[in-house]
Amino acid sequence: MSSSEQLDDGFTGLKVIAKTEIAQGIFRFELAHPQGMLLPAFTAGAHLRVRVPNGSIRNYSLSNDPQERERYVIAVKRDANGRGGSVSMADDIEAGDLLPVATPQNEFELIENARQFIFVAGGIGITPILSMMRHLKASTDLPFKLYYCTRNPELTAFRDELLGAEFANTVVIHHDFGNRADAYDFWPVFDKPSSGTHVYCCGPRPLMDSVLDMTGHWPPGSIHFESFGVDQSRFAENRPFSVTLGRSGIDLEIPVDRSILEVLRDNGIRAPSSCESGTCGSCRTRLIEGDVEHRDMVLREDEQHDQIMICVSRARNDVLVLDL
């Protein structure tokens, strides 16, 4: 890669000053400006948009304290069954390389008027949560509790830090060892809503679904979700359909293995996006016509008749007409 840090398309090359395997198949990357300059500020819960060596664009959450302006820290789980971005990061990037990144964005910010926080993380979903915890410890006196679910100790990212003195009495780490019957029982946590408490959950879709199911009686707006990537294999019955763009009249075909958002990009049509898992709301689009299978975790029931999250949701019938 070129030694110049300024790249095209809004990306800047940051130097990888350290790469460390912090758990089995999970790598931490520390990034800094090549000339030692301060980096653009970010807030807890933010993510970096990264152009990985194979050319893909991926989002990775920042895990360090936002007060640290001299570096960004991300963690990547190598997933051989994923879309290739994590494998390219794990296998092709080494300390000393330049990695193209865009300015941090945040669709998962902490609520300013909260009295306390409950954090739920699964697997690599710990990354934005850890940034939030570090921020709260360094800058506030607000109480919080983390429930972190992983398969086993070897797959637990940041385990030593979480069990250290800094977070004493604020962290519960649970291992299910691959047995669903041994999953953590969250009902005692969410049985009784607490005024001013906000819940932040990041992890695999089954974990988020479980938290969503158990918090239906909580006040609206008090439960927040974030996830990067979506497992389309859980929708084995995907069927192709068509999308008509209402403003231009363009017709697009959506195959079983591509999302509306991906097909728009393939055709040079820009649409806002961030998480690409139906949890942040960035790709909310007005629906003009059609019957939608809503797969997001954002839209309320009263919004589903005229809106769609184009990163995950699909058509129940043959054609959707969108206000694009």
From Swiss-Prot:
Q: Where is NAD(+) bound in this sequence?
A: 115-229
Q: Which SUPFAM superfamilies match?
A: 2Fe-2S ferredoxin-like, Ferredoxin reductase-like, C-terminal NADP-linked domain, Riboflavin synthase domain-like
Question: Per the record's keyword annotation, is Iron included, yes or no?
Answer: yes
The cofactors named for this UniProt entry are: FMN
Q: Which residues form the FAD-binding FR-type domain?
A: 9-111
**Coiled-coil residues:** none
Q: Under which main EC class is this enzyme filed?
A: oxidoreductase
EC annotation? 1.14.12.7
Report the residue ranges that make up the 2Fe-2S ferredoxin-type domain in this protein: 241-324
What pathway does the UniProt record associate with this protein? Xenobiotic degradation; phthalate degradation; 3,4-dihydroxybenzoate from phthalate: step 1/3
User: Which molecular function GO terms apply here?
Assistant: 2 iron, 2 sulfur cluster binding; metal ion binding; monooxygenase activity; phthalate 4,5-dioxygenase activity
Query: Which residues take part in binding [2Fe-2S] cluster?
Result: C275, C280, C283, C311
Induction info reads: Induced by phthalate and repressed by glucose.
**Reactions it catalyzes:** phthalate + NADH + O2 + H(+) = cis-4,5-dihydroxycyclohexa-2,6-diene-1,2-dicarboxylate + NAD(+)
Keywords in alphabetical order: 2Fe-2S, Aromatic hydrocarbons catabolism, Electron transport, Flavoprotein, FMN, Iron, Iron-sulfur, Metal-binding, Monooxygenase, NAD, Oxidoreductase, Plasmid, Transport
A single BP term in Gene Ontology: phthalate catabolic process
Family statement: Belongs to the PDR/VanB family.
Subunit text:
This dioxygenase system consists of two proteins: phthalate oxygenase and phthalate oxygenase reductase.
Please state what the protein is called.
Phthalate 4,5-dioxygenase oxygenase reductase subunit
Which source organism? Pseudomonas putida
